[in-house]
From Swiss-Prot:
Bias type Low complexity, positions: 324-335
Protein name: Cyclin-D3-2
Keywords: Cell cycle, Cell division, Cyclin
Record bears the keyword Cell division: yes
Keyword Cell membrane: no
InterPro entries: Cyclin (IPR039361), Cyclin-like_dom (IPR013763), Cyclin-like_sf (IPR036915), Cyclin_C-dom (IPR004367), Cyclin_N (IPR006671), Cyclins_cyclin-box (IPR048258)
Family (UniProt): Belongs to the cyclin family. Cyclin D subfamily.
SMART domains: CYCLIN, Cyclin_C
Pfam families given in the database record: Cyclin_C (PF02984), Cyclin_N (PF00134)
PANTHER family for the chain: CYCLINS
């Protein structure tokens, strides 16, 4: 008897968690809704069952959120690239900047999502830290960038351009499709097929879901956070920070611009939830201000009590949130509207050589 009661209580608890998923009209219908006269009698029933479905299990939702954030924090160091001493290599820094500037231009050209660009940068950095870039093969970084962007688009986008169509926006080198495909397989093998890393956007999404019910600016908040992230992602100085630290610093900076009613409370909750090192966050925050000097000036000039001042700041800061490269600015004016071009001739299916043979083929020639 005790076992039956325990099982019944367990089932009732499971149904309570799912009660919020039922539609209201379903609560009144039962198998015997027709009375003796053939009329519906569910309207005469008590509305208590309807009322109970209007409340979500908030406690369970917060428990799920806590589990999610703990999982993100525990996994972020597993797929977080760290150059270490290699960051001092001027040749590597130069190649990375050129390659990632091209990635961001193609992102704008085709209208890819911000997550696609961030994934491409993550793949690029993780792969480049695992090999030694040869100075006599400057085209290698461009090939890795093309393959990384192609893989990221296949993971995130609904429509993906052909490999030859992907090489737009003044690509320095042009590679055949089979060469890019070989590099794709080499990247997949090197990264052990772990193509869903934890990124700053992972934390943006979590915070928006967490505070979205009591804050009406979540869409604008997300847009500005992603824009600021894209503007600094090619800067190697930000590679020393974990995604949670970078995300926290970005969100604090955006909160200061949007100025919600409980700005200080939001910032405190974010820092507590993400369990980040406050000193690292402050250091990253100052670096963000240094990267966006116009934002720092405007934050000192805008009157916090003036709604018009906040609006003027938003309009004037847009230019500093774009990708801060001369090549990006010059190419954006000449780039057409985001459009996926399709070629009629399909690329031939490549054969799958061994990893060793593939590596030799890739390194032999850029063509």
């Amino acid at each position: 008897m005790a076992l039956e009661k325990e099982e019944e209580a367990s089932q009732n608890g499971a149904f309570c968690v799912l009660d919020g998923l039922y539609c209201e009209e379903e609560t009144g219908f039962v198998e015997d809704d027709l009375d003796d006269d053939g009329d519906l009698d569910f309207l005469e029933k008590s509305d208590e069952s309807v009322v109970k479905f209007q409340f979500l299990p908030l406690l369970d939702m917060f428990l799920w959120d806590d589990d999610e954030i703990l999982s993100l924090i525990s996994k972020e160091n597993e797929t977080n690239p760290c150059f270490g001493e290699q960051i001092l290599d001027g040749f590597l820094v130069s190649c990375r900047k050129e390659a990632l500037d091209w990635v961001l231009r193609v992102k704008s050209h085709y209208g890819f999502t911000s997550l696609t660009a961030i994934l491409a940068v993550n793949y690029f950095d993780r792969f480049m830290t695992s090999i030694k870039l040869q100075t006599d093969k400057p085209w290698m970084s461009q090939l890795v960038a093309v393959a990384s962007l192609s893989l990221a688009a296949k993971v995130e986008e609904i429509q993906v351009p052909l490999l030859l169509d992907l090489q737009v926006e003044e690509a320095r080198y042009l590679f055949e499709a089979k060469t890019i495909q070989r590099m794709e397989l080499l990247i997949l093998s090197t990264l052990q097929w772990r193509m869903h890393p934890v990124t700053p956007i992972s934390f943006f999404d979590h915070i928006i879901r967490r505070f979205g019910s009591k804050w009406h600016q979540q869409l604008d908040f997300c847009r500005k956070c992603e824009r600021l992230l894209i503007s600094v992602i090619a800067d190697t100085r930000f590679m020393r920070y974990f995604p949670s630290v970078l995300a926290t610093a970005i969100m604090i900076l955006v909160f200061e611009e949007l100025k919600p009613c409980d700005e200080v409370e939001y910032q405190s909750q974010i820092t507590t939830l993400l369990k980040v090192n406050q000193e690292k966050v402050n250091e990253c925050y100052e670096l963000l201000l240094e990267h966006n000097p116009s934002k720092k000036r405007m934050m000192n000039l805008v009157d916090q009590d003036s709604p018009s001042g906040v609006l003027d700041f938003d309009d004037s800061s847009n230019s500093s949130w774009n990708v801060s490269t001369t090549a990006s600015v010059s190419s954006s004016s000449s780039s057409p509207e985001p459009l996926l071009k399709r070629r009629r001739v399909q690329e031939q299916q490549m054969r799958l050589p061994s990893i060793n043979r593939m590596f030799l083929d890739v390194l032999s020639s850029p063509r």
